[in-house]
Amino acid sequence: ERRRMLRNAPHLVEILPFLIPMFGKGGVIPAKISRLLGIAMWGYDLTGGWRIGKFHKRLDYDETLAYMPTLRRDRLVSSYLYYDATVDDARLVVTILRTASLDHGAVVANRTPAVGLEKDSEGRINGVVVRPRGTGDDEEFTVRTRAVVNAAGVWVDDIREQDEGTNPDSIRPAKGIHITVPWEKVRNQVAVVVPVPGDRRSVFVVPHGGLTYVGTTDTDYDGPVDDPQCTPDDIEYLLSALNFSIEGTVTTDDVVGTWAGLRPLVKSASSGRTADLSRMHRVLRSESGLVTITGGKLTTYREMASDTVDEVIEEVLSRDIGFDG
């Protein structure tokens, strides 16, 4: 999917180098850890790196510091450099919407929440009640449909409740936050993966213009999904990871911006941490015909859409109504 994005939207997606510093006591890293990480890098190349024509490199001490001179010199041993990709997510979404509208006749409307579902005499969904905001009187009206897709992210259970009458509690929201600090505090030439002390996670340190983004967290969230917030504990978590790997100290006073979001992870009884939950997506179809897509991530958006459309086609054909009326 990453290769497809690079091919289909080269103006929005570009290859991004990632550096994984290896630290050790007294400048020595355990041979087992070094060997395991090397195997992981080759595994990454075989499953994805070769598709974009980029393979990992092993860098020595001096080569590593050339990419990020603020790394802890007393603990740094060497590093691995591998390649992934980055995308302008907002422009990608707008581009897809423009293509759907201009090339395929889709009607695109934001600030138009779905407040209800209508069903025919057999209990099959045949309309969505919407309430456009900003029209003055917030008038409701019904959009007649042959199929309805519920792709509401962390709000999918709210839509399913309109359909099923009860909340299925199928989503486990996971909060992720990023902080922004001045680039001069970090001086990384590429994206860098740094470990979180006392945790089994790592975070990314990504340069962007005159700033550096640090993130993300991955924690359970039970607050209002309309307004996730970055807390002081979130900021401290990311700063501790950054300061563990660099010389000098970045403080809360250096943080010039934060943002927070929620991942609509599919709930699983087998995992205690959101970080351990699968990012795989799931497509469901209710008895009334509502098609719901949950889980997933931006990289696999095309595959998610393809699977969803396949389910929509099955729904329409099962009702024997066709796509022409």
Give short role names for the model-derived ranges.
Residues 1-67, 203:
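Dinucleotide-binding Rossmann-like beta1-alpha1 core, especially the glycine-rich loop
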Residues 45-47, 65-104, 125-129, 143, ...:
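Helix-loop-beta segment of a Rossmann-like dinucleotide-binding subdomain
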Residues 99, 158-161, 166-213, 219-325:
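C-terminal catalytic lobe of FAD-dependent flavoproteins
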Residues 107, 116, 144, 202-204, ...:
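Short, surface-exposed charged micro-motifs
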Residues 107-109, 256:
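General small-molecule cofactor/ligand-binding pocket signal
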Residues 110-126:
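A conserved short coil-to-beta-strand element within the FAD-binding core of flavoproteins
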Residues 136-147, 151:
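Core beta-strand elements of the Rossmann-like FAD/NAD(P) dinucleotide-binding domain
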